[in-house]
């Protein structure tokens, strides 16, 4: 019987490039003719995605699935932790809400979850040639070792060899790699088969003596040095280079809510060459944007009250008299008349006044809506997904923005979102609403016409993503020892 080949990418800390390296390896293995699956046992992020069957998962594994040529599925990220407040999070297990917990409560659940993960992983072994596993944070969090289910604990559970990645761009990469190895147990050190230096800028010849000294100290080889290069690929943590086109003529501003979620809603906008995207964090940042986006939130009521307290709500209301506003999910709810929370899902407040810019009321329910949708308006097709606890009820005279005709592949007929009578303030529950060409093109061309600019065709975001995935794979393949990697995974 064929044995599944496994490789795990761990890192010296957060944001060292684990996700992007896993993405690259998934595309490389796919290019080489293997069936490959990405996997991360536990992810913590506010950004999430809804699968074709209505399950919720982390965005990083979605991009990795695309790199592998797969439809994203929740088993690729069985545990998703979504922070809801200080020391608290919502646990998503196998794509469905498991419950809310404090950090300590979740820590005490890990043994039980570990057993579930081990059983579930057996199903992956039967479907693929290779699985590329991503760790979280650092394996050297020695206070978490006894119940670890995402780094060395998981590598041991499934008997996966490990490559340890370090970020040279932030400085101290040799100390980070050597220090991490020092804090591992002997068994864990034996599992590490190589290191990867990520985000390198400069002359490799200057780096080589350091690599030799590092190998002498930790007794494992450097598998590759990957250059620093930015790709137009989504970032699950929202670390978006919004100012990439800082001098572009179209100014799009996003309200940076304290509990902002689903940063990836703006990724498709940032690839347009004449668009600049920036965050607004205070009244002083507001300026005169061509489009204002009020994004999703993990706690809509608390974020609305924060906007009210800092004066941004009044700026938004003032801007609505002349500017264009789009609210997405929680942002849509904020633009409505009232937000009612009878079950105290988000707040102790039973009712909170909204901004009053859209003629809808929101009622927060106990059950979360998670669904993939296709929708249209008079002349525009959109697609995306919904993740929300609230339901919006239309008041007299309210006008829906879209008609949803498909939910998770089933025919439906229901309204989504709202648009005001003037047509300049609108809201929708659909995340990813800008990913499709038609709505993005319509919104941007309306702005271009108002600024006497030439209209343009929108860039096909999915095609651009595929091109960038291939470019990423080429870069990583050129700069790491793939023969060595195939050797350690037994291929």
From Swiss-Prot:
GO terms for biological process: cobalamin biosynthetic process. The keyword Hydrolase does not apply. The active site is at 329 (nucleophile), 431. Residues 249-439 form the GATase cobBQ-type domain. Pfam families: CbiA, GATase_3. Gene3D superfamilies: 3.40.50.880, P-loop containing nucleotide triphosphate hydrolases. The keyword Mitochondrion does not apply. One of its GO terms (molecular function) is catalytic activity. PANTHER family: COBYRIC ACID SYNTHASE, DETHIOBIOTIN SYNTHETASE. Belongs to the CobB/CobQ family. CobQ subfamily. This is Cobyric acid synthase. The gene is cobQ.
């Amino acid at each position: 019987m064929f044995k599944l080949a496994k490789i795990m990418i761990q890192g010296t800390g957060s944001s060292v490039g684990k996700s992007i390296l896993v993405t690259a390896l998934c595309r490389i293995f796919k290019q080489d003719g293997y069936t490959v699956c990405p996997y991360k046992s536990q992810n913590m992020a506010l950004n999430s995605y809804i699968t074709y069957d209505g399950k919720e998962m982390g965005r990083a594994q979605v991009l990795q699935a695309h790199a592998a040529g797969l439809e994203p599925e929740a088993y690729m990220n069985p545990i998703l932790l979504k922070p809801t407040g200080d020391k608290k999070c919502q646990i998503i297990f196998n794509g469905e809400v498991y419950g809310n917990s404090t950090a300590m409560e979740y820590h005490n659940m890990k043994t039980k979850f570990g057993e579930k993960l081990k059983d579930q992983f057996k199903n992956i072994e039967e479907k693929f040639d290779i699985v590329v596993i991503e760790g979280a944070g650092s394996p050297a969090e020695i206070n978490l070792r006894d119940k670890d289910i995402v780094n060395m604990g998981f590598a041991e559970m499934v008997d996966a060899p490990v490559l340890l990645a370090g970020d040279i761009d932030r400085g101290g990469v040799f100390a980070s790699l050597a220090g991490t190895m020092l804090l591992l147990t002997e068994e864990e050190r034996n599992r590490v088969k190589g290191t990867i230096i990520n985000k390198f800028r400069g002359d490799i010849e200057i780096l080589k003596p350091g690599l030799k000294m590092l190998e002498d100290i930790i007794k494992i080889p450097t598998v590759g040095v990957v250059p620093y290069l930015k790709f137009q690929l989504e970032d699950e943590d929202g670390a978006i280079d919004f100012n990439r086109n800082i001098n572009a003529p179209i100014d799009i501003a996003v309200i940076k809510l304290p509990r902002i979620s689903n940063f990836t809603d703006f990724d498709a906008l940032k690839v347009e060459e004449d668009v600049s995207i920036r965050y607004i964090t205070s009244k002083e940042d507001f300026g005169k944007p061509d489009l204002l986006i009020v994004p999703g939130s993990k706690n809509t009521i608390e974020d609305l009250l924060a906007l009210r307290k800092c004066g941004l709500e009044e700026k938004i209301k003032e801007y609505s008299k002349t500017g264009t506003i789009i609210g997405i999910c929680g942002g849509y709810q904020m633009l409505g008349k009232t937000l009612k929370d009878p079950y105290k899902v988000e707040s102790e407040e039973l009712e909170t006044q909204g901004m009053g810019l859209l003629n809808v009321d929101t009622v927060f329910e106990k059950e979360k809506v998670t669904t993939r949708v296709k929708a249209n308006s008079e002349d525009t097709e959109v697609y995306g997904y919904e993740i929300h606890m609230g339901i919006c009820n239309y008041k007299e005279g309210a006008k829906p923005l879209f008609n949803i005709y498909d939910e998770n592949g089933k025919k439906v007929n229901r309204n989504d979102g709202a648009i005001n009578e003037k047509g300049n303030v609108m809201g929708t529950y659909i995340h990813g609403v800008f990913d499709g060409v038609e709505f993005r093109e319509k919104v941007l061309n309306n702005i271009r016409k108002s600024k006497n600019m030439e209209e343009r065709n929108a860039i096909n975001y999915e095609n651009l993503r595929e091109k960038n995935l291939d470019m990423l794979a080429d870069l990583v393949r050129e700069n790491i020892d793939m023969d060595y990697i195939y050797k350690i995974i037994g291929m």
